């Protein structure tokens, strides 16, 4: 929930009320705007924040090393795949630097369960842990669309934003 006073109180309790946070984003339209909105909410709490906007050629060289940056993750066929790529201890794309042996054990358990309904219970515990540990700020899931005109077939949007070029063609 949006609680600027509570956020400020937590920073004061930690002795970091005057610490200036740097929020880094790539110079594009939606990630820049999303990070600007996050910075505004931090400022609403009276917490100092500096925005740094980098060109893609600079941002992507160090994206996983910034202490606070905005990135995006597109959908994977299984929800657990993003967790394996981005949250498991020691993996290259773990931009959060998150390391929790209990999380890793639950992730291994969930990965071993073939039945989606059985896996759902473990995934719920994993997702609660990410929330409770404050690992990431996830403001929204970005909708992806593909626009095309009549007369073509096979242009449906793939859930992972993957273009299935071999299905594209002209309608008969």
Predicted feature descriptions by range:
Residues 1-12, 30-33:
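Structural transition elements
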Residues 8, 57-60:
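Short hydrophobic/charged patches on amphipathic alpha-helices used for structural packing
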Residues 18-27, 49-52, 70:
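Short, well-ordered beta-strand elements
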């Amino acid at each position: 929930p949006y609680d600027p006073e509570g956020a400020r109180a937590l920073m004061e309790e930690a002795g970091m009320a005057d610490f200036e946070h740097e929020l880094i984003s790539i110079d594009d339209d939606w990630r820049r705007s999303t990070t600007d909105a996050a910075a505004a909410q931090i400022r609403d709490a009276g917490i100092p924040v500096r925005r740094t906007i980098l060109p893609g050629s600079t941002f992507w060289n160090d994206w996983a090393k910034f202490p606070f940056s905005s990135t995006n993750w597109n959908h994977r066929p299984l929800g657990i795949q993003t967790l394996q790529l981005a949250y498991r201890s020691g993996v290259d794309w773990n931009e959060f630097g998150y390391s929790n042996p209990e999380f890793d054990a639950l992730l291994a358990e969930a990965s071993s369960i073939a039945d989606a309904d059985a896996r759902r219970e473990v995934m719920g515990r994993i997702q609660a842990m990410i929330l409770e540990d404050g690992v990431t700020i996830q403001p929204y899931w970005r909708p992806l669309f593909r626009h095309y005109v009549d007369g073509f077939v096979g242009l449906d949007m793939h859930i992972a934003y993957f273009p299935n070029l071999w299905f594209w063609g002209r309608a008969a």
